[in-house]
Regions:
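Compositionally biased terminal segments of proteins
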Residues: 1-174
Length: 174
C-alpha cells in the first residue's frame, strides 16, 4: 500500500506537485518479514523506534520488531540517503487500527483507494497521521487536500481528530 506517491510529477490524490525526500509506503506490521525477504540484498532495513535507528541485519524471520516500532527506514547502504520510510500499520485481516490511538479504527477494505492499479492510503487517513507533527509540508498537504475531500471523509477526519487530538487546529476548518 502506498500512502503518498507521485504520478508523473504530481501527487496521486490532489494532482499538486510537491517535492519529496523519500517515498512513504505503508504495510501491515505482520508483513515485515515478507518485506525484509523481498528487499534482502537490495536495500538495508532499519527499525525506527522511539528516535533510535537500528540496522536489522539478521534473517528476516529471526529478528523481532518491537511493538513500539512505528517505522522502518530503507536505503541502499549506511552511506546512502534514506529512500523509503515504511509506516507499520496495526491491522487484523479485517480491521485497521490507528497506531497512536486504538479507539480509532476502520474496516481494512476502506482505508485504501486505487488509481491505475496502485493502492494508496486514503487521504483522510494520511492526514490523521500527519496531524501529530504539523510540519509546514503537512499543513500544506491539509490545505491542498481539504477542498477535495468528500463530506464523509471530512467527517471521519474530524471525528478522528476529536478523539486523537482534541482541540487540533484543523478541527475549525473541518
Amino acid at each position: 500500500m502506498v500512502d503518498r506517491r507521485r504520478v508523473g510529477d504530481r501527487e496521486a490524490f490532489s494532482g499538486v506537485h510537491r517535492p519529496h525526500d523519500d517515498v512513504d509506503p505503508s504495510i501491515p506490521r505482520s508483513d515485515v518479514s515478507l518485506l525484509r525477504e523481498h528487499l534482502a540484498g537490495c536495500l538495508d532495513v532499519w527499525s525506527a523506534d522511539s528516535g533510535t535507528f537500528r540496522a536489522l541485519l539478521g534473517k528476516a524471520d529471526g529478528e523481532a520488531i518491537p511493538d513500539t516500532c512505528e517505522n522502518l527506514w530503507l536505503r541502499a547502504s549506511g552511506a546512502d540517503p534514506w529512500q523509503y520510510d515504511v509506516i507499520l500499520m496495526d491491522t487484523t485481516p479485517t480491521t485497521w487500527t490507528f497506531k497512536r490511538d486504538d479507539r480509532i479504527s476502520l474496516p481494512i477494505d476502506s482505508i485504501l483507494w486505487t488509481r491505475d492499479g496502485i493502492d494508496y492510503l486514503r487521504p483522510e487517513v494520511q492526514l490523521l497521521h500527519k496531524a501529530n507533527s504539523l510540519r509546514p509540508k503537512d499543513r500544506d498537504d491539509f490545505a491542498v487536500c481539504l477542498p477535495l475531500l468528500h463530506a464523509p471523509a471530512r467527517q471521519w477526519l474530524k471525528n478522528a481528530l476529536e478523539v486523537a487530538h482534541p482541540g487540533h487546529t484543523w478541527l475549525v476548518e473541518l
